[in-house]
Amino acid sequence: MAGSDLLLAGVLFLFAAVIAVPLASRLGIGAVLGYLLAGIAIGPWGLGFISDVDEILHFSELGVVFLMFIIGLELNPAKLWRLRSSIFGVGAAQVMLSAAILGGLLMTTGFSWQAAVVGGIGLAMSSTAMALQLMREKGMSRSEAGQLGFSVLLFQDLAVIPALALVPLLAGSADEHVNWLTVGMKVLAFAGMLIGGRYLLRPVFRFIASSGVREVFTAATLLLVLGSALFMEALGLSMALGTFIAGVLLAESEYRHELEIAIDPFKGLLLGLFFISVGMALNLGVLYTHLLWVAVSVAVLVAVKMLVLYLLARLYGLRSSERMQFAGVLSQGGEFAFVLFSLPASQRLFLHDQMALLLVAVTLSMMTTPLLMKGIDKLLSRRLNPADDTGEAPWVEDDKPQVIIVGFGRFGQVIGRLLMANKMRITVLERDISAVNLMRNYGYKVYFGDATQLELLRSAGAEEAQSIVITCNEPEDTMRLVEMCQQHFPHLHILARARGRVEAHELLQAGVTQFSRETFSSALELGRKALITLGMHPHQAQRAQLHFRRLDMRMLRELMPVHTDTVQISRVREARRELEEIFQREMQKESRQLDGWDEFE
């Protein structure tokens, strides 16, 4: 692809994403499906703006590579070892059972047994990119279902290696003699990567960090990720597996969070590019001519994988609600099918349009997953939050809540306990099923659901409640809820959790005045105790704390109009100097009144 063509393709990708993804999110079908639809629109079977799909699809696999690196950073070797039974137990069982059933069904439709074996293995794999993205969106990452799902995906990545080696054998094109010297060299190279990464990565990053130049640190991170991927590809292994191992090796390092911050923007853009490329690869010509076959095959593919996954989750001991999420999020075909089915040896096994039909089925199965997960969420909402006898709004009881709490993590739990201790009627909305089940065991009135859905808020009693407390982890969810409540429930008193000053500024701009910065009060309290240990009178330390709170809040409000402007840095420095001067004057005045107590809002 020429340079000008590449630039044009980049502009088209960005334009399609900017238009399609917000529309998809507004329609409630999720960003992933928005990317896929954008790809169909600009691809060769849509408006035809881009025709070189294979090259772009190969490049866009870097999105999965970056994602696996970040996942590796979140897992240390000890945690990975604890997952070994689910990786090699549930993961292996899922691949073998799904491949056997799907391969057998392919043989009944005219596939040779060799093509059916390759097809069954390819269809048994799930989309790592889509599954992990959806698990994060649904808050499943830290749940038991999410951990089991990740284990299955990791085994599938490991299974890529023997699957690629199997295809030439089935096609009858494998060498008669195995070059054991080459195999041994690859094993030694892989072992060298593990040992070198274990002992060299941290000193190298320590040296780079000592330069104090952030851009160099970002460049080193990109070099590590892309270098690991290239090295593994040269060995004939999965690129994603290589970057995952690099991430695990750095999971316990002091640079873990800085690495994640450096990689995250690239990961998001490249993942979007990957989903757009998958949409572009959808062959609508094959779909039109074999519509019935494709429709049935997609339905069978999703149903078989869901059934296998659900049964394995039951044997593993997951709760029924988590089984459905686990089965749904892994029910699609995956990106590995594009690699496996496109091998020259594979192309000799498939007849006529068989390969194209399988790829269309895989692509469409990926498009069903966001819709399937949306349906599962609604089903679980009805099951976990049963309707009352009147048949009116689901699961609303006669004693209407006074307060709705959105999010019941550690922050939300403290608020809920305080309100319940004072006999306040609360309703809690939480989208992590494991948290819902756990809190219900302790007597909390917690309900499963995504509070950014308007109907769910209505069902929770937002029209009758007096206040809503928003404790979401994601700032985007917080601001979406604020906007929704202001538009549809203007009577509600909105109280919100702010993770830092930037989010506090956004809340102030939105008109929310009742918010709490999650670490601010606890940091002030610890600072007050530090002043006492340094010899300050307890009353004076208390007054110092109150003065600082008042002045900091004043500065927060004054800086709110310019928090996104280029003048922010100079204004912050000016405000800091002013804060120090006022603080010194106040403390000199109050030093003569050690026993006084003031209240500041």
UniProtKB/Swiss-Prot annotation:
Domain RCK N-terminal residue range list: 400-519
Location(s), subcellular: Cell inner membrane
Record carries keyword Plastid: no
SUPFAM superfamilies: NAD(P)-binding Rossmann-fold domains
Source species, domain of life: Bacteria
Keyword Phosphoprotein among record annotations: no
Annotated Gene Ontology cellular component terms: plasma membrane
Alphabetic keyword roster: Antiport, Cell inner membrane, Cell membrane, Ion transport, Membrane, Potassium, Potassium transport, Transmembrane, Transmembrane helix, Transport
Family: Belongs to the monovalent cation:proton antiporter 2 (CPA2) transporter (TC 2.A.37) family. KefB subfamily.
PROSITE patterns, alphabetized: RCK_N
Source organism (scientific name): Klebsiella pneumoniae subsp. pneumoniae (strain ATCC 700721 / MGH 78578)
Primary location class: membrane
Coiled coil: none
Any one GO biological process: proton transmembrane transport
Residues annotated as transmembrane: 4-24, 29-49, 55-75, 87-107, 115-135, 152-172, 177-197, 207-227, 230-250, 268-288, 291-311, 326-346, 356-376
Top-level taxonomy: Bacteria, Pseudomonadati, Pseudomonadota, Gammaproteobacteria, Enterobacterales
Gene3D superfamilies registered for this protein in UniProt: 1.20.1530.20, NAD(P)-binding Rossmann-like Domain
A molecular function GO annotation: glutathione-regulated potassium exporter activity
Protein task: Pore-forming subunit of a potassium efflux system that confers protection against electrophiles. Catalyzes K(+)/H(+) antiport.
Subunit structure: Interacts with the regulatory subunit KefG.
Record's bilayer topology term: Multi-pass membrane protein
Name of this chain's protein: Glutathione-regulated potassium-efflux system protein KefB
